[in-house]
Structures are given as C-alpha cells and as structure tokens.
Amino acid sequence: MELGDLLVAVPLGLLAGALAGLLGIGGGLIFAPLLLWMGLSPHQALATSTFAIVPTAMGGSVTHLRQRSIPWREGLILGVSAFLSALLFSRLGRLADGWHLLLLQSVMYLVLTVTIRSEEVEAASDAVAPLPLLGLGGVGVVAGLAGGLLGLGGGLVMVPLMVRTLSVPIRLAIRFSSLAVACSASAASLQFLVEGRGQPSMGLLLGGTAAVAAQWSASRLDQVRPGLLATLLRALALLLALDSGRRALQLALQMP
C-alpha cells in the first residue's frame, strides 16, 4: 500500500468503523469500493474486504458484550449459524464471475431500500418479546451468504430482516447484527486464507483502524433515535445499489 493510498484508507477506515458500530454493519460497503478503487479485482477486493470486516465487527461486538446488551442464547444461535453458513458460501464465490457478484450486491441493496420504514421503526416499542430461535438461525444464514459469497458483513440485510420479519427492536437488531457479522466474516476469512485469496495484511490494517471507531460509536448507540438509524440504513443501501450496479455493468461490457 503506497502512501497516497494510506492517506485515503485511514480516514475511510475510521468512517467505516463509525458506521459499523452505529448500524451493525461490517464496513464492507466502504471497504469493497475502496479496494476496487485501489486496483484490486472484484474477487480480491471482496476477500480483502472480508479480512477488514473481522476486527471492525469485533470492535462493536466487544462493546455490546461488555454492556451485556446481547441475550446470550439468541446471540449464540445467530453466531454459530452465521459462522457455518459462511464456510459454505465462501466456497461458492469462486464459481461466479466478478460482475455476477456485483450485480447480486446491487439487487440485494435495492430490495433493502423498500424493506424498512423510518416511521414504523420510530413507532415500534423497545420491549423485547420472546424471539424465534429458528428465525434467528435463518438470519445467521443470510449473514453467511453476505460474508462468504459477497465479501460483505451483511448488516444492511440482517437489520431490516430482523426488524420487519421477527419484530426485533432496531437497536437490539443492530447488536445482533454486529455479532453475526463478526462470526460470518471470521469463517469466510479462514476459507480465503486457505485458498490464498485477498490480501490479509491490507485488510487487517483497514479493519484495525475501523475497530477503534466502531467501539466508540457502538457505545453511543442508545443515544440515537431509531428512526434516524433506519433512515441511515436506507440511504446507504440505495447509494450502494447504484454503485454496485454501475461497476457490474462496466465489467459485463468489458467481457469478450
């Protein structure tokens, strides 16, 4: 990594970490485009992004665990299902072309822009009803898909999914998401290391920087209105849908 790249990567890493701790994402929404801009191929960028997500998500998760704000049984089921499914999906990523992965990202983000409503989240209660363990296991599989196949943490998918389908309060969904992202990214990173994909040192440098900001923002999650959290999630999803779609189209047009 050259000095110019470093001067760009460090502040963007801090931004990724701040968003990760606040929204329960892994930071891949910033890491992946940054690594593509730095010249990595889509497969290499997505693998390196996964390496960066590990310390980023762990930074937020450690804060939530210290505060004892994650129910242990539900968190364990979510984390284990995310870890195991990421091992599976990380093997499948090699079978797809780079533009296929980017197109899948774009479609996923577009769906998210209409799945969560700020007004519904604002009106929802913070009281926690008994959570369906099977449903949380399914959310963990979604995290594994995002982390293993797409090189994303999956928080932008999991948080709306838990809020809309499982009626999980958005702050708790964000905490669950941070834990699931850490587990799925860890599993996918192990597979990528075995296969020799990505650049671990670059990923850990980005992630280590982001982890500092993730711990800071995660500790302040309760100070942010639920409606604002939902609005931020939707705005990021729309922005990334457009960017991923543009990159997918460029790669598809370059193919012989």
Q: Model features per residue range: what roles?
A:
Residues 10, 15-29:
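Single transmembrane alpha-helix segments in multi-pass membrane proteins
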Residues 149, 182-189:
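Hydrophobic alpha-helical segments of membrane proteins
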Residues 1-16, 34-38, 42-43, 62-146, ...:
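Juxtamembrane transmembrane-helix boundary motif
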Residues 42-47, 174, 178:
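Small-residue hotspots at the loop-to-helix junctions and early N-terminal turns
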